[in-house]
């Protein structure tokens, strides 16, 4: 479907992409990984035609459509939530409008009119095209996707300008999913999702008809979704089979092999340089010295990938507490008529490790503040 061929991109002295070559198939599920600043977003922008490489090519089949979700910065305004989501089907809705207008015109013409059969044929063409879009199911699809991403039925008529930045990104995700491009480019799509919406998105993308290329720091999400992993490191694009866990294992094997090859090459270079230095001025060895110099110049030197800097820290030990740290019994909390917490009972003991989950607005932060 899409071929990346020898992509090169350089910012100043730094290579972002160096001879990057890969392919993306019709149904591929690919995780794009690499350290911050490695070039992941840049590669997505190149695929979305928002940035040009210095050289190389992105070959796409004629039928390919691409949808790109940036990390942030998308603001929708001027429509209700439902209308904004519906705009993903703009071409389909335009066809419906054209058919209605043409049908009205057709009724005003005589059957012997010169334009009658031309318009009739055009309506037939448009109707056949609409059949592929299953227009009757559009309202169901729109509401299904919006509900999956955490919107309530009461949100449908709200103006998009009423939603915060995180919910704006959910609207953008919904529109992309509804538009159903051949390739989805998703840059950190789970950043603004609660765990329930994240699981819904994960399952939706598994069933998605097209290909998906996703950037995420959520290893479990990548493992669950992806069957292939692209890694960008020091400008190189490495391709691995499997999700993130498989990538980690294969990457370690590749790097260990690279280090061994590097050490072996360095020893050979050192031996050659010693020979050259030792016999450089000896006439009987002149031809051998020149031969070694040429061989040294032709060596394609192996480069070792530098390890990412990591930060190590630890919390100072807390004063020893009693066995029961916190105990809540029949705790209630309301904001006006809205009951956020009702009859919550919980005991937290020394050494417990707890996760608090729930939909956005369910009351997680409120409970944490009450406990604090």
Please report, for each region that a protein language model flagged, where it lies by residue.
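ABC ATP-binding cassette signature C-motif
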Residues: 1-262, 309, 316-372
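Intracellular alpha-helical coupling/juxtamembrane segments of multi-pass membrane proteins
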Residues: 250-306
